[in-house]
Structure formats: structure tokens, C-alpha cells
């Protein structure tokens, strides 16, 4: 293994994640399932995917949604997310992915035998077609500040949100710890199984920041481990009393 890769693992927190995976493997007495992104990609109907690509694919999509039609790349990215959460180890979980997009993350989870549900807006026909192609269940809902999520009929062991935009991303309404507190408390009370985990992945703002010092401090006070853009609660701790009083 190259030295540069080892150093990158240390400084991004990947070393901690890797160590925990090894401990969990030892505790469970099993190795992770042997599969890779290429193997999973081959399970997607090539003719149906090609038809979607021909409708929406562009040579240089930039930051626009057709970039997600680079199937192999995004399968690799989402497989890493799955492994970082230990979803390739242990038993069957219920997984909710908020802002599920094309559904790749949930497709891999479903491939591993997990019970999955996505949540997103219905604004990009290409996302809808990909979710349908992958056979991923999805509910349509717009997340708003200080508004609870709908009753989904069950609770989840793992709740994720990748490349988040619902937090007022790149606007003058970027969420503070008060909005995040309402959101997290709502998840904890109505959507999350006791002891479940929440993993949030933030996008960079115009100033290239991922979160304010206030949000970082608040998240860590609730038990989060922060690795670059990823804020991982495992488990989520109650809100600090001072913040809870202020938010209300």
C-alpha cells in the first residue's frame, strides 16, 4: 500500500473507519461479503440503462444531474458509503436514504438483503426512471425547516442523507443548529430505531465551507464523528440542554 494512501486515510478519518470494520468483523466472526462495484453494476439491465443514458446523457455534465449516469463511478462511491456504515456486515437492516437521487446507495443495500426506502423530490424524470429501473422504493416529500417527516409506517436502523441540499444549501437560508436540532430530534423520535445510526453528508457552500464552527461543535456534542463532509451519529445523543432551550 502506498505511503500517500496511508497518510490520506489517517487525515480523513478512514483509518478509524477501517479499524472499526476489522473489529466488527472479528466480533461477528465473519468476513465482509466478497463483491465489488463492477459485479453490482452488471446486475443492472444494460438495455434499459442504455435507453435512459441516450435520453439524458451528455458528454460533459459538469455538476448537473446527468453526471450520475457514470454508472461505474457512482456505484464505487456508493459501495464505499455502504462499507463505511458496515452495511456489508451483520444482519438485515432497515435503511432510509433521504435525497436518494438515482437510488444507487439503496440499490447496493437492497442487493445485500436490506429493507430499503428512499425519499426525494419528483423533479428530475431521469432520477425517477433510474429508481424504477433499480427497483428501489421511494416516497416523494420535500423537507422543510422545522417540519417533521411524514409517517413512513416503520422505523429504521440506518438513516442517511448524501450530498445534502435540503438544508438551504447555497442560499441565505442555510440551516443553523436550531434547524438541525429539530430535524435530528424528529428522526430520533419518529423514524430511528433505538440505537440506530444517522449519517449526513454535506455539500460545500459558496465559500467552500462544509459547516460552521457552531454546527461542528453542536454535532460533536450529540456524539457525531466528523470526517470531512460526513457527520456520523452512532448513536445520536440527546441535544445539549442549553441549545435545546434556545431552539425552543
Place the predicted regions along the sequence by residue.
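A short SAM/SAH-binding and catalytic strip from SAM-dependent methyltransferases
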Residues: 157-177
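A short glycine-rich, Lys/Arg-flanked "PGG" loop and its adjoining helix->strand segment in the class I
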Residues: 174-194
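Conserved SAM-binding loop of SAM-dependent methyltransferases across substrates and taxa
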Residues: 102-112
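Conserved beta-strand signature within the Rossmann-like core of class I S-adenosyl-L-methionine
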Residues: 194-202
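Class I SAM-dependent methyltransferase SAM/SAH-binding core
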Residues: 110-137, 144-145
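Conserved class I S-adenosyl-L-methionine
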Residues: 92-101
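A short acidic, Gly/Pro-enriched loop at the edge of an enzyme's catalytic core
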Residues: 149-158
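Conserved alpha-helix/loop element of class I SAM-dependent methyltransferases that forms part
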Residues: 71-92
Amino acid at each position: 500500500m502506498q505511503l500517500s494512501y496511508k497518510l490520506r486515510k489517517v487525515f480523513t478519518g478512514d483509518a478509524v473507519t477501517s479499524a472499526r470494520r476489522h473489529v466488527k468483523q472479528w466480533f461477528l466472526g465473519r468476513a465482509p461479503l466478497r463483491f465489488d462495484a463492477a459485479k453490482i453494476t452488471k446486475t443492472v439491465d444494460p438495455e434499459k440503462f442504455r435507453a435512459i443514458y441516450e435520453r439524458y446523457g451528455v458528454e460533459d455534465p459538469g455538476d448537473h444531474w446527468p453526471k450520475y449516469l457514470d454508472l461505474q463511478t457512482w456505484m464505487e462511491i456508493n459501495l464505499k458509503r455502504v462499507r463505511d456504515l458496515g452495511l456489508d456486515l451483520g444482519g438485515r437492516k432497515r435503511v432510509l436514504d433521504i435525497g436518494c437521487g438515482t437510488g444507487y446507495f439503496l440499490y447496493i443495500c437492497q442487493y445485500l438483503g436490506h429493507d430499503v426506502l428512499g425519499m426525494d423530490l419528483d423533479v428530475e424524470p431521469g432520477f425517477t426512471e433510474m429508481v424504477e429501473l433499480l427497483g428501489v422504493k421511494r416516497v416523494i416529500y420535500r423537507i422543510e425547516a422545522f417540519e417533521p417527516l411524514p409517517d413512513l409506517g416503520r422505523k429504521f436502523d440506518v438513516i442517511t442523507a448524501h450530498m445534502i441540499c435540503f438544508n438551504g444549501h447555497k442560499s441565505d437560508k442555510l440551516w443553523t443548529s436550531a434547524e438541525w436540532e429539530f430535524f435530528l430530534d424528529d428522526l430520533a423520535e419518529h423514524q430511528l430505531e433505538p440505537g440506530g445510526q444517522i449519517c449526513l453528508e454535506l455539500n460545500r457552500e459558496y465559500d467552500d465551507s462544509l459547516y460552521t464552527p457552531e454546527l461542528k461543535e453542536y454535532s460533536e456534542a450529540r456524539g457525531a464523528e466528523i470526517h470531512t463532509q460526513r457527520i456520523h451519529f452512532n448513536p445520536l445523543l440527546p441535544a445539549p440542554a442549553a441549545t435545546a432551550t434556545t431552539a425552543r
